[in-house]
Amino acid sequence: MCSVARHMESIMLFTLLGLCVGLAAGTEAAVVKDFDVNKFLGFWYEIALASKMGAYGLAHKEEKMGAMVVELKENLLALTTTYYNEGHCVLEKVAATQVDGSAKYKVTRISGEKEVVVVATDYMTYTVIDITSLVAGAVHRAMKLYSRSLDNNGEALNNFQKIALKHGFSETDIHILKHDLTCVNALQSGQI
């Protein structure tokens, strides 16, 4: 009887371990299958954001649009972004290295690392990016919607809302950025 009980304990332990591994895997962001980095390159407008970062998220209700230029340099993804922060436009240039699949990248900065995952894109009109970063010892997530154009983004915004809700953000976490191109124009003209 004792060996039967041990055998049953072993089976239950492995079953629980398998269940835990399955649940942990289910929490990761979906990644675009067959991601084509060459189609992803170019200019993107940042038009919406989902964030649970408290004051950071609240500040975005009145924020101006940002932008991102994606280039390939020496086998690294070179990202030049501009965004509005505390009353002025900020320019950030970083390199991203590919991790665990073609649509997942790691960005290393002085302030820490970010994991950037392309979770949805059609390459021609929109892309949704899930960003995980370590801020003051805590893990924070944000999701951003980028568009190739400023026109006819209704469907992209609806898709973004569905994706953000599916990834654990609430409707109050989702913010459409103000149609103010101050930072975008500064990036395009090189004035930042």
Swiss-Prot record:
Residues 1-26 form the signal peptide. Disulfide bonds join 89-183. 2 different forms with differently processed N-termini exist. It comes from the Eukaryota. It is found in: Secreted. InterPro entries: Calycin (IPR012674), Lipocalin (IPR002345), Lipocalin_CS (IPR022272), Lipocln_cytosolic_FA-bd_dom (IPR000566). One of its GO terms (biological process) is retinoic acid metabolic process. Epididymal fluid of the caudal and corpus regions (at protein level). Keywords: Disulfide bond, Secreted, Signal, Transport. GO terms for molecular function: retinoid binding; small molecule binding. The keyword Transport applies. One of its GO terms (cellular component) is extracellular space. Transmembrane segments: none annotated. Induction: Down-regulated to 11% of control levels 5 days after castration and is not detectable by 20 days (at protein level). Levels are partially restored by subsequent testosterone treatment. Belongs to the calycin superfamily. Lipocalin family. Associates with spermatozoa in the epididymal fluid but does not bind tightly to them. Binds both all-trans and 13-cis retinoic acid. May act as a retinoid carrier protein which is required for epididymal function and/or sperm maturation. This is Epididymal-specific lipocalin-5. The gene is Lcn5.
